[in-house]
C-alpha cells in the first residue's frame, strides 16, 4: 500500500471512529479524554485539591478532564512541545521535556512542592523506523519516571502511556521498584490495533 493510500485510510478510520465522533459531540479536545475518564473510573486516582503534572498534554484531552476531578483548589501544570489552547485552571508550559531549559521552567512552577500524581501521554514523533521509534518512546518514559520519582509525594501515583515492544517489560520492572502497586490497563477507547497500554502505578515508596 502506498504512503498516500495509508494516509487516506487513516483519515477515513479516524473520522469514522466512535470515540472521535463522541469527542466532537461532547466538545472534548480529543478522543484521549475518554482514556483518562476510563482510568479515573477504574482507579479513582484524582481527588479534590490534588497537585497534578500532565506531560505530553496537547491538545488538552487529559487536562480538561483532570482539572474537573481536582476542583478549584487543585493545581494542574501541563507541558507539551506543541501549542495548547488555554484551559481554565491549568498552567501550561510549551517546551521540550528533555531540555534543561524546559525542566527548569517546570521546576520553578512546582516551587519545591510535592506532587500527588504525574500523568504522561507523551509519544515521540514517529519516523517509521519501529526500532528507533520504540527506543525514543522508552527514553521519554524513563524521563517521565525519573521526574515522577524525584517530585512525587510519598504514596503518590504515576500514569504513563507505554507501547508494547522492546524495552517495555524492562521499563515496567523499573516502575515496580518505586511503587507498591503497578498494573497495566488498556482503555476501551484505545484503538484495538494499537500497541499502547497504560501503566498505572500507585503507592510511591518515597
From Swiss-Prot:
It catalyses: uridine(2552) in 23S rRNA + S-adenosyl-L-methionine = 2'-O-methyluridine(2552) in 23S rRNA + S-adenosyl-L-homocysteine + H(+). Gene3D superfamilies: Vaccinia Virus protein VP39. It is found in: Cytoplasm. Its EC number is 2.1.1.166. It is an enzyme of class 2 (transferase). Keywords: Cytoplasm, Methyltransferase, rRNA processing, S-adenosyl-L-methionine, Transferase. The active site is at residue 161. S-adenosyl-L-methionine binds at residues 60, 62, 80, 96, 121. One of its GO terms (cellular component) is cytoplasm. The keyword Transferase applies. GO terms for molecular function: rRNA (uridine-2'-O-)-methyltransferase activity. Pfam families: FtsJ. Belongs to the class I-like SAM-binding methyltransferase superfamily. RNA methyltransferase RlmE family. HAMAP family: RNA_methyltr_E. Specifically methylates the uridine in position 2552 of 23S rRNA at the 2'-O position of the ribose in the fully assembled 50S ribosomal subunit. PANTHER family: RIBOSOMAL RNA METHYLTRANSFERASE, RRNA METHYLTRANSFERASE 2, MITOCHONDRIAL. This is Ribosomal RNA large subunit methyltransferase E.
